[in-house]
Structures are given as structure tokens and as C-alpha cells.
């Protein structure tokens, strides 16, 4: 599930057999934890009453929904699960999720209340000018030059970047066909990350204002578009508070600040209260790298954490 287009170099006996495809983000570990938890639930179901649930006396098979969700790495599978009404169908009242995290000590559970991960969106800027020979540059409208100006202007708008952290970076720019002609078209591609929707909307609005100013100044046409992307991951305070208590002996850690990466778990949190957590691998090997791996013993911590979460 969610294999990435990377050739694995771990040398593990369970390494991918498919060239150019590997589990490099821990999603295989996420599945293994849920499968292990499912086995525990299955073992409990015939106990009378189930010892895990003696205090509340409910059948775990009607009160625990395990979601094996694909496509986090692509289109955001959580979005489609929500749109198809899965949470409503099973009367989900709260939701929890883990992600293996190499930058935290082995088996440590880490999370925080409030903003935890960023909203992400792809930004596209199209600039239409007019071509001319470089010796008659005054007859053209230089889309390449305007594109460079646009990037510089956007990068230098501190009034748009308030105290709430945000990242706006352009990583790709295409323009022109030949070296001695004024470019008539430029395309710029980038990414925007914000921890709240208000900051995101503000930055998009300011980019459109800059586009309008340049349209008037250069007689060009600039179009700024963006994808819907993933919402920000924002953890419920009550669930965080309870989790921090029940995980105290498992090596719990409260994160000091949010991360600017994104995860589609945020779609679930738009429907019901949720808590997203990291489970440390302690390896320091980055996600999405060819040598990403983890000690499988940490999965036992994840399974135990899920067991305890059913008591919340």
C-alpha cells in the first residue's frame, strides 16, 4: 500500500522485489500495527465479558473501525473515504492515527494539541506576454523577466507572512523556446504550506494582488491557480489530554511545534474529533529515502497504544 517510485537499498531480507517500488514512508508498518490490533480484537471477541472492555461492556467489533486507507501519497485516500460516508455509516465519534517518524527516539509516541501538520497546496502561475526578436525587445512583453520579477516580489512580502508559520517556495520555472527571442509564456510551479486556512487564503489573495499590479504595469496576463490540497492536521485537545495520560508509561512526548509537512488524516478531522501521532523509529533515516527502514519491535508499542485508545 502506497509504495513509492524508489529503488530500495536497505538490503533487508524483506526488501521490495519490484525494481523502482518500495515502502519508504512506513505505511507497511502502519498496516502491520492495525493487523496486529485486529488480531487482538479477534482474540477478545469471545470472552465473556471481554476483559479489555469490562468497565464499559461493549463489543469491540461494533465499536472499533480499522481503516486501511490507500493513496495518502497521491490523491488523498482519506478524502474519498469521507466523501463516501464511511465515518457516518459506522457512526464514528473520534479517530486516531499513527505515522512512523525517524526523527524521534525509538518507540516514543509524540504528538501535540492543536496544529500539528500543515495544509499543503500546489501553486501554478501562468504568464502570457508577447514574443519578439531580442534586437527588437521593446516590441515584446518579456514573460521570463516578468516571471522573475513576480517570484522576487512574492518572496519579499513580509506583511503577508504573519506570525503563523508558512512556507511558499517555487521549484520549477519554464519559459521560452530559443535563446535570442523574447519569451511569450512562462510557467512557474511551487508549493504553499500553512498551519491555518486564514493564512493560506491571505497569501493566495496577496499573490493575486501582485498579479493584477503586474498585469497593469507590463500589459501581460498572469493567472495564479492552486490545488485544493490537504487541510491542516489539527488535533483535538480533549483527545490529546487523555492520550498523554494513558501513554505516560510508554514514553510519551509532547511536540514543541508543528511540522510543515502534510497528511490527509486532516480530512477525517474535518468530520470528527481526531488525534494524529508520531511513533518514533529512532533511525534518523529520512522518509522517502532508498534506505528507509525500522526496527519492527516498535510496532508492538503501536499495537499497545491502539489497545489503550479504546478506553478513551
Report each predicted region and the residues it spans.
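DPxDG-like acidic metal-binding loop motif
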Residues: 31-38
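A generic secondary-structure signal
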Residues: 40, 84-85, 213-214
Amino acid at each position: 500500500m502506497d509504495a513509492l517510485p524508489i529503488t530500495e537499498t536497505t538490503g533487508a531480507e524483506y526488501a521490495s522485489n519490484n525494481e523502482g517500488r518500495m515502502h519508504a514512508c512506513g505505511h507497511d508498518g502502519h498496516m502491520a500495527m492495525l493487523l496486529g490490533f485486529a488480531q487482538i480484537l479477534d482474540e477478545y471477541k469471545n470472552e465473556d465479558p471481554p476483559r479489555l472492555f469490562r468497565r464499559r461492556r461493549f463489543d469491540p467489533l461494533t465499536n472499533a473501525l480499522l481503516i486501511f486507507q490507500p493513496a495518502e501519497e497521491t490523491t488523498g485516500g482519506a478524502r474519498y473515504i469521507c466523501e463516501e460516508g464511511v465515518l457516518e455509516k459506522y457512526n464514528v465519534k473520534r479517530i486516531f492515527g499513527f505515522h512512523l517518524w525517524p526523527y524521534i527516539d525509538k518507540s516514543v509516541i509524540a504528538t501535540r494539541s492543536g496544529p500539528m501538520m500543515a495544509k499543503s497546496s500546489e501553486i501554478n502561475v501562468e504568464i502570457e506576454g508577447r514574443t519578439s526578436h531580442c534586437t527588437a525587445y521593446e516590441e515584446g512583453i518579456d514573460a521570463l523577466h516578468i516571471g522573475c520579477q513576480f517570484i522576487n516580489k512574492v518572496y519579499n512580502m513580509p506583511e503577508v507572512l504573519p506570525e503563523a508559520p508558512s512556507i511558499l517556495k517555487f521549484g520549477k520555472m519554464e519559459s521560452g523556446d530559443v535563446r535570442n527571442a523574447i519569451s511569450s509564456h512562462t510557467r512557474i510551479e511551487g508549493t504553499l504550506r500553512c498551519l491555518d486556512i486564514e493564512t493560506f487564503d491571505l497569501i493566495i489573495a496577496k499573490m493575486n494582488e501582485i498579479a493584477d499590479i503586474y498585469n497593469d504595469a507590463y500589459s501581460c496576463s498572469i493567472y495564479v491557480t492552486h490545488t485544493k490540497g490537504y487541510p491542516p492536521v489539527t488535533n483535538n485537545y480533549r483527545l490529546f489530554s487523555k492520550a498523554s495520560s494513558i501513554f505516560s508509561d510508554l514514553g510519551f512526548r509532547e511536540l514543541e511545534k508543528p511540522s510543515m509537512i502534510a497528511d490527509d488524516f486532516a480530512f477525517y478531522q474535518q468530520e470528527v474529533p481526531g488525534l494524529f501521532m508520531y511513533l518514533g523509529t529512532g533511525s534518523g533515516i529520512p522518509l522517502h529515502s532508498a534506505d528507509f527502514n525500522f526496527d519492527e519491535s516498535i510496532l508492538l508499542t503501536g499495537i499497545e497504544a491502539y489497545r489503550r485508545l479504546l478506553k478513551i
